[in-house]
Amino acid sequence: MNKIQHKSQFWAISSEGMNKVISSSFPAEMKEAIASVDAQGDDKKEVLRDMLSVYMTQRQRMTNDEGIAEVHLHGPMLSDASPIDLAMGSTSYEEIREDIESANMDDDVKAILLRVNTPGGTVSGIEETYEAIKSSNKPVFAYNEGYATSAGYYLIAPAESIAASPSSMTGNIGTVLDMWDFSGMYENMGAKRTLMTNEGADLKGTMRTEPTDSQREFLQNQLNDMGDQFHARVVESRPDVDEEVYRAGWYQPDAAAALGLIDFKGTLKDYKSMIKSAIDIRTQ
């Protein structure tokens, strides 16, 4: 299921349902173009992505600005994001890793700048992306353009330095699981759901109804394990961060700097000038 935004509405929708949304929402020439696509698999994804980009804003891929490779972490970050997800402004973990790899292979690149404006992302895919950033053979810097929260901060923690826009928010270190119990709604509709599992598989169905005590304990342990890993990565990268940040608050730049989450507050232009000066010193 894909959670997407189109105009002023939100949907939780299947791929088949999304095809109907596209069919009813886009101009006739767009519908005809989509119907005419005869490519399959990844080729078809690329064609559809290009078409959708005419109507929607996609994440910008890596660019090289005078030796600084700019890698964008914008919108919700997902593993194996669909063309619709990407067309709606999400970021694919796979694309981030590809951009980091490309920057490391480019002799004209002297440093990597992560430009961040993301509320976070899925746990799946985050560790591989963190390792790609941490193991970069070129220095990595990070700039928070608006939000560097949750998974967004997880990924920029290993940067050599982190700067933030004066109007940005940083932090929200922790993991969350959001569950909805629709049983009451279905009962009002006259429908009652019965869930059966094989004996001993009592943790099945934990995401669809009010969890039992054992199911809740299992889910809490999963969250704690993921939260502990997040905590460990921040400590590993920025050992002087104040323990207060692990309550998952998010902070404006002055508070974020005082807590050790960022190093500088300023404009992107000033931060890039500082990076270029640092590169010049290292290459002399």
Q: In which residue ranges do the predicted regions lie?
A:
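N-terminal organellar transit peptides
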Residues: 1-284
